[in-house]
Amino acid sequence: MNFRFFSIFVFILVFQTPSSMAELSIQITQGVDDPIPIAVVPFFMDSGSVLSEDVAQIVRNDLEQVGEFRALPLSNMISLPDEEQEVFYRDWRILAQDYLLIGKINQQPGSQLIRVQYEFFDVNREIKLAGEVLTGNVTQLRDIGHTISNVVFEQVTGVPGAFTSQLLYIVSENAGPNTSLFKLEKSDYDGARPQVLLESGEPIMSPSWSPNGQEVAYVSFETGLPRIYVQNIASGQRRQITNYPNINSSPVWSPDGTKLAMVLSKDGSPD
């Protein structure tokens, strides 16, 4: 699975302190005038297990959130195929659907491993556009769903999907009278699975992903002055890399991830 990494250079102001209230919410308020109709059939679970994530619903949400697709409501579906021989194209043409996605999930009893098989069809041309088997741990169901969304999006639009992207953003919470708590967080592109990377009583600014997504550079005022830090995402280990007078800001990684460009004013004016 390929992941992309983006930084949001804004503060998200959160005044409720419970973590459930602080989750990042991303909403698309306007899409195209004539969204593409697509039917995403619930994926058949052949082992009878109940999973923590609904892969088909993740795909529906992904495609609708970008504003270019309109998913068929489940209540309008007249059949629920889970393999190609069960697909009757006329049924989906009657429902005015251009595309159809079906799938099935298998989990061995007592195992955390899953096997997700999906197939994607062009209803009007009556052909299968894509299909494959994805395997992973049950904790990767969201990643698998986003990966399928990428395939569907690219097959239809010709543009690579970005649903496996991750975001960096900064949250400012009201921690009491005249007191703020700043958090550097990362999440899926849709705000799901937020993870706090750093908490501070002083401002945090300008988060920047390393090209391989394993580290993040940012500006922290924890010493009372703006200083640039680099932090490993997995371990949480961090190191201060600048301590110049005045401005130390705006870190940006080189394409190979070995260097950082930044704005400094150690000689009196920003460079």
Named regions from a protein language model:
Residues 161-163, 211-212, 255-256:
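Residue-level detector of Asp-centered blade-edge/turn motifs that repeat once per structural unit
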Residues 160, 172-183, 199-202, 219-228, ...:
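A flexible loop/linker signature enriched in serine peptidases of the S9 family
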Residues 16-17:
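N-terminal signal peptide c-region/cleavage motif recognized by signal peptidases
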Residues 27-90, 101, 105:
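Short beta-strand->alpha-helix linker/helix-N-cap micro-motif
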Residues 24, 84-151:
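Amphipathic beta-strand/beta-sheet edge segments enriched in Tyr/Trp
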Residues 167, 213-217, 257-261:
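Hydrophobic beta-strand positions that form the internal "hydrophobic ladder"
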Residues 188-205, 231-249:
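Multi-bladed beta-propeller domains
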